[in-house]
Swiss-Prot record:
Statement: the UniProt record of this protein carries the keyword Secreted: no
Protein's organism: Yersinia pseudotuberculosis serotype O:3 (strain YPIII)
Keywords, alphabetical: Aminoacyl-tRNA synthetase, ATP-binding, Cytoplasm, Ligase, Metal-binding, Nucleotide-binding, Protein biosynthesis, RNA-binding, tRNA-binding, Zinc
Protein name: Methionine--tRNA ligase
Top-level taxon of origin: Bacteria
Sequence similarity: Belongs to the class-I aminoacyl-tRNA synthetase family. MetG type 1 subfamily.
Gene name of the record: metG
Residues that hold ATP according to the record: K335
Cofactor(s) this protein requires: Zn(2+)
Cofactor binding summary note: Binds 1 zinc ion per subunit.
Residues noted as binding Zn(2+) in the record, renumbered to the chain: C146, C149, C159, C162
Entry-linked InterPro entries: aa-tRNA-synth_I_CS (IPR001412), Anticodon_Met (IPR041872), Met-tRNA-synth_bsu_C (IPR004495), Met-tRNA_ligase_1 (IPR023458), Met-tRNA_synth (IPR014758), Methionyl/Leucyl_tRNA_Synth (IPR015413), MetRS_core (IPR033911), MetRS_Zn (IPR029038)
Cellular compartment(s): Cytoplasm
Family matches, as PANTHER family: METHIONINE--TRNA LIGASE, METHIONINE--TRNA LIGASE, CYTOPLASMIC
Residue ranges annotated for the tRNA-binding domain, each copy included: 573-675
Length: 675
């Protein structure tokens, strides 16, 4: 019985419209595109959409700094984003914007339904207000002196030096990060989405078995700590959609951003005329809906988004496909090191298929971080794609073209071997379907080894010199070309550009179902180089270019210039500080904070709990476990919103991604005093 084609809608998270696409972003779009291309090869009807996330205070302020209207800025950024995605052959059917008529209408519709169903609550809150700019200030737009450690220039919600969390009103000498003015407290009525009302539904959805285990486990932690009502409005001035019948109130960007998935699809429906919006978004839709997202936005997509859809009588996602972060050479992407590489910069130097292949070879269905090791990247692409796959074609095509006028043999030299290759279609398809592209690549490369071993053993270059063996030569080389065809069919979802050149060379389309029948008596075209090796020097040029692109056009600064040495203290003052070697037993995220990590430290007979503001530099806290560090052990315990912090770990750096946890030399033991 023929398999019934599925109808599938696939989305990627919407890139924010105030910056360029970089190689970290590309992981998600490549992963999704590989899955989409595979589904299309299998005959499923897939609609693949995305859009720019184009609202919010950061966009409004950046446009002001540039001296242009936000609409102009987001239009220019959208053009750049679409050019980058096209350069990487991301096969979107539609790329739209959240700043659209469709999104405005759908946001108003969903809000209206939520309000009518009793899920919108009003209450008055107090916020800091910039009297010069005439705007309420989000926590991140207030800076001042930390009330705990007295570090200057700290954000309004968290100290990046000591890790303390607080409200903006607790800052010493707070200033607006927008104007520099001293903010004042003002009250404002805000609208809240009653997320706790959907707790039972969300827990049932979590336990349905569809979600990744890591996502379900994380959601259970949020349920255990209790869901809170969600503030969905912001006050003017704000770049976004005004709330209906509420002048001066705007939808918070995270309300209308996921609705952008619906808006982008509605726009596609209107363009095409043959798509039914309700077939994919209606309450009882039988189609599949999948969101590819990063682990940093699971909270919004696994709680708020399905609750919003449920409360407004729309369907929920079939599943969320969540991936980890990208590191480069084992560390966070760095502008100073040149590893913060823009997509556009990459495309100036290298073939997009190279990165697509490398990511595919490392991706699985788990939420694991992917390391783009640039030396390994060069070697893997050159060995796998060039040496194993493309070389298989070049080793055989020359003889076919020169000795047999481009005509393949009428019979298959080794039907049993060929069947081994085609039998692998089932397991490779299962791997692709389950987003285990790394597993698929491993199986494909194992077959490539077998194919090359066959050619090595048959030695067509030797046979070609022997009289009376033209038929053998023809059969061997035709077999090699047919094995190459099967391999490239399996790689088609990953390598679209190479596939296009391969189809032109083989003079046939590569389809999943056609590999059962080998190419016999078939004419191929003259062989031309299908793929170029990567030169490490080219990669180094790209890194150097990224350093130049990202270098600030300001005077050269350094740690001492940026952070001068403080006033001299006496030896007696210093002697009061008791620093100890500590072993990090456990490191984990702190729910409700995007700055803190919770560390459990072993001091050699005593265990301490510490909250440290180092999350921005260590996106995978598990990597810290088992590591030695230095802590201040006699600091008075500090009660924080998340618990009691019993000391402080020592780190260097200006903050953000450039925080470096100190470690002792080898031989140091937990509990040893630092003198």
């Amino acid at each position: 019985m023929a398999q019934v084609a599925k109808k599938i809608l696939v989305t990627c998270a919407l890139p924010y419209a105030n910056g360029s696409i970089h190689l970290g972003h590309m992981l998600e779009h490549i992963q999704a595109d590989i899955w989409v291309r595979f589904q299309r090869m299998r005959g499923n009807q897939v609609h693949f959409i995305c859009a720019d996330d184009a609202h919010g205070t950061p966009i409004m302020l950046k446009a002001q700094q540039m001296g242009i209207e936000p609409e102009q800025m987001i239009a220019e950024m959208s053009q750049e984003h679409q050019q980058d995605f096209a350069g990487f052959a991301i096969s979107y059917d539609n790329y739209h914007s959240t700043h659209s008529d469709e999104n405005r209408e759908l946001s108003s519709l969903i809000y209206g339904r939520l309000k009518a169903n009793g899920y919108i609550k009003n209450r008055t809150i107090s916020q800091l207000y910039d009297p010069e700019k005439g705007m309420f200030l989000p926590d991140r737009f207030v800076k001042g002196t930390c009330p705990k450690c007295k570090a200057p220039e700290q954000y309004g919600d968290n100290c990046e030096v000591c890790g303390a969390t607080y409200s903006p009103t607790e800052l010493i000498d707070p200033k607006s990060a927008v104007s520099g003015a001293t903010p004042v407290m003002r009250e404002s009525e805000h609208f809240f989405f009653d997320l706790p009302a959907f707790s039972d539904m969300l827990q049932a959805w979590t336990r349905s078995g569809a979600l990744q285990e890591q996502v379900a486990n994380k959601m259970q932690e949020w349920f255990d700590s209790g869901l809170q009502q969600w503030d969905i409005t912001r006050d003017a001035p704000y770049f976004g959609f005004e709330v209906p019948d509420a002048p001066g109130k705007y939808f918070y960007v995270w309300l209308d951003a996921p609705i952008g998935y619906m808006g982008a699809f509605k726009n596609l429906c209107d363009k095409r005329g043959d798509l039914d919006f309700d077939e994919f978004w209606g309450k009882d839709a039988k189609t599949d809906l999948y969101h590819f997202i990063g682990k940093d936005i699971v909270y919004f997509h696994s709680l708020f988004w399905p609750a919003m859809l449920e409360g407004s009588n729309f369907r929920k996602p079939t599943n969320l496909f969540v991936h980890g972060y990208v590191t480069v050479n084992g560390a966070k992407m760095s502008k100073s090191r040149g590893t913060f590489i823009k997509a556009g910069t990459y495309l100036k130097y290298l073939d997009a298929d190279c990165l697509r292949y490398y990511y595919a070879a490392k991706l699985s269905s788990r939420i694991d971080d992917i390391d783009l090791n640039l030396e390994d990247f060069v070697q893997r692409v050159n060995v796998d794609i060039v040496n194993k796959v493309v070389n298989l074609a070049s080793r055989n095509a020359g003889f076919i073209n020169k000795r047999f006028a481009g005509q393949l043999a009428d019979q298959l030299a080794d039907p049993v071997l060929y069947k081994t290759f085609t039998d692998a279609a089932t397991s490779i398809a299962d791997a692709y379907n389950n987003r285990e592209s790394g597993k698929a690549i491993r199986e494909i490369m194992a077959l490539a080894d077998v194919a090359n071993r066959y050619v090595d053993e048959q030695a067509p270059w030797v046979v070609a010199k022997q009289e009376g063996r033209d038929a053998d030569l023809h059969a061997i080389c035709s077999m090699g070309i047919n094995l190459f065809r099967v391999l490239m069919t399996y790689l088609k979802p990953v390598l679209p550009s190479l596939t296009e050149r391969t189809e032109a060379f083989l003079n046939t389309e590569l389809t999943w179902d056609s590999i059962e029948q080998p190419l016999l008596g078939h004419s191929i075209t003259a062989f031309k180089a299908l793929f170029n090796r990567i030169d490490l020097d080219k990669v180094n040029e790209m890194v150097a270019s990224s350093k130049e692109d990202m270098a600030p056009a300001t005077r050269v600064t350094g740690p001492l210039a940026d952070d001068p040495i403080q006033e001299t203290i006496s030896f007696d003052d210093f002697a009061k500080v008791d620093m100890r070697i500590a072993l990090i037993q456990q490191a984990e995220f702190v729910e409700g904070s995007d700055k803190l990590l919770k560390l459990t430290l072993e001091l050699g007979g005593e265990t301490r709990q510490i909250f440290s503001g180092i999350r921005s530099a260590y996106p995978d806290p598990k990597a810290l476990e088992g590591r030695m560090t230095v802590m201040v052990a006699n600091l008075a315990p500090r009660k924080m919103r998340f618990g009691v912090s019993e000391g402080m770990v020592i780190a260097a750096g200006p903050g953000g991604s450039d925080i470096f946890l100190l470690s002792p030399d080898s031989g140091a033991q937990p509990g040893m005093q630092v003198k």
